[in-house]
Amino acid sequence: MDLNVELEFIKEPFHIKDMPLKKVYVLDDYLSTTMHHTIDDKITRNAFWGKNNQVNSNSPTGLPHHSFWGAGYFRGHDQTIEHDMEPKKTYLMRWFNRKLQTDFGFMWERFQYFGLNSQTQGLEGTTHADCEPQDDWNLSFLYYPNKFWNDSWGGSLRMYDKMQQGIHGRAEHIKNHQVAEVYFKPNRLLIFDGRIPHGADAPKPAAKYMDRRSLVIRGDEISLKTLWGEDAYD
């Protein structure tokens, strides 16, 4: 695949007409203020968070590449609810998942995961990809639900032309292999090919105890049909 990433800032959703995606799309103010704030309230006032977003390493110390807070809603082809998640707490996120499919004109054929990430200062996200190289028809979404974020707090999403394992050498990897940077901004939605290596910066010390929150929605394969089974581009 071509890793010369091109960013395109769009003003409204569009029906996808061709796969794999050729660009990384950024859509600001995706949800109404009411829905944006409702989602943030729902995820910050629940006790389902755990230190479960971990990328393991082969280090003899047993230490992971990265480990930060997360929560899973549902995963897999049948979108099975995570074992420690109450069904009623998934309703809003199932609405969000349907909205993405309606707004962008597709259906999940091999759904992978819907969950949350939370990073405070020091919890850098190391480089990873969301799916396997052969999954041409994959799709990844990131949505940023924080109500407020100061630009000086950092938290950029970085995309690369090459994978890199672990936190050691990350600064050099950014210098030599970064191909795109997307700033963290409340109510921002990103749509991209999940095979692109990427990772999110931790908030800077100026953020104090503020955390960088994101909704993660991704699948290994989509079809360009609406939820009613019609061709999305007709």
What are the residue ranges of the model-derived segments?
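Non-heme Fe(II)/2-oxoglutarate
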Residues: 2-107
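Non-catalytic N-terminal targeting/anchoring module and adjacent flexible stem/linker
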Residues: 1-2, 234
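Catalytic core of non-heme Fe(II) oxygenases with the double-stranded beta-helix
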Residues: 90-234
